[in-house]
């Protein structure tokens, strides 16, 4: 943020040349006071934006130090959250792949039930493993599955 952001300051060059030296000095002092007030307000705004400084009286150096610490902390936190999002996306893709494989195994098991074989209780899934007709195509035990089917949730993708 530069000194010129959000502030309208008249320059000395915009004034007519016929002003006295005292008028020029007064005008220059007013512009300088306005610039200093803007800087002061900006430091107060920055101080109030940093949680560890809110409402405290702090020097400009302390405000800058704490603001720097807070920005670094938030960057680390954002990086960690982005890693979590990436991990969840990978996990979601893996789970969706497993769901598709199980649905495919279930549909192939249902097709095989239409063609009676010598043993109607065992079928072969897409991986070539033998499964029970009562298994639903799952390679895991039924003890680990929830009693109610969980609805699939889509991961909301945000533009980054």
Curated annotation (Swiss-Prot):
Which positions does the record annotate as the modified residue N-acetylserine?
2
| Compartment(s) of residence | Nucleus; Cell projection, Dendrite
Q: In which tissues is it expressed?
A: High levels found in the brain, heart and lung while lower levels are seen in the liver, kidney and skeletal muscle.
Per the record, residues carrying Phosphoserine are: 2, 11, 107
Q: Where is this motif: Nuclear localization signal?
A: 152-156
Q: Which residues does the annotated region (Leucine-zipper) include?
A: 81-102
- A Gene Ontology BP annotation from the UniProt entry: positive regulation of transcription by RNA polymerase II
- Transcription regulation recorded as keyword: yes
- Where do transmembrane segments lie in this chain? none
Can you tell which superkingdom this protein's organism belongs to?
Answer: Eukaryota
Assembly and interaction partners: Efficient DNA binding requires dimerization with another bHLH protein. Binds DNA as a heterodimer with MYC or MAD. Part of the E2F6.com-1 complex in G0 phase composed of E2F6, MGA, MAX, TFDP1, CBX3, BAT8, EUHMTASE1, RING1, RNF2, MBLR, L3MBTL2 and YAF2. Component of some MLL1/MLL complex, at least composed of the core components KMT2A/MLL1, ASH2L, HCFC1/HCF1, WDR5 and RBBP5, as well as the facultative components BACC1, CHD8, E2F6, HSP70, INO80C, KANSL1, LAS1L, MAX, MCRS1, MGA, MYST1/MOF, PELP1, PHF20, PRP31, RING2, RUVB1/TIP49A, RUVB2/TIP49B, SENP3, TAF1, TAF4, TAF6, TAF7, TAF9 and TEX10.
What pathology is it implicated in? Pheochromocytoma: A catecholamine-producing tumor of chromaffin tissue of the adrenal medulla or sympathetic paraganglia. The cardinal symptom, reflecting the increased secretion of epinephrine and norepinephrine, is hypertension, which may be persistent or intermittent.
Q: Which family does it belong to?
A: Belongs to the MAX family.
What is the role of this chain? Transcription regulator. Forms a sequence-specific DNA-binding protein complex with MYC or MAD which recognizes the core sequence 5'-CAC[GA]TG-3'. The MYC:MAX complex is a transcriptional activator, whereas the MAD:MAX complex is a repressor. May repress transcription via the recruitment of a chromatin remodeling complex containing H3 'Lys-9' histone methyltransferase activity. Represses MYC transcriptional activity from E-box elements.
User: What name is this protein filed under?
Assistant: Protein max
């Amino acid at each position: 943020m530069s000194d010129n952001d959000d502030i309208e300051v008249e320059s000395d060059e915009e004034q007519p040349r016929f002003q006295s030296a005292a008028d020029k000095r007064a005008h220059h002092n007013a512009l300088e006071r306005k610039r200093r007030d803007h800087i002061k307000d900006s430091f107060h705004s920055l101080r109030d934006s940093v949680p560890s400084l809110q409402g405290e009286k702090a020097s400009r150096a302390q405000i800058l130090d704490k603001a720097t610490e807070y920005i670094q902390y938030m960057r680390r936190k954002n990086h960690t959250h982005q890693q979590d999002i990436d991990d969840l996306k990978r996990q979601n893709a893996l789970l969706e792949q497993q769901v598709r494989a199980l649905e495919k195994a279930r549909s192939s098991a249902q097709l095989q039930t239409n063609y009676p074989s010598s043993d109607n209780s065992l079928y072969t899934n897409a991986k070539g493993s033998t499964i029970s007709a009562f298994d639903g195509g799952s390679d895991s035990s039924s003890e680990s599955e929830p009693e109610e089917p969980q609805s699939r949730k889509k991961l909301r993708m945000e533009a980054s």
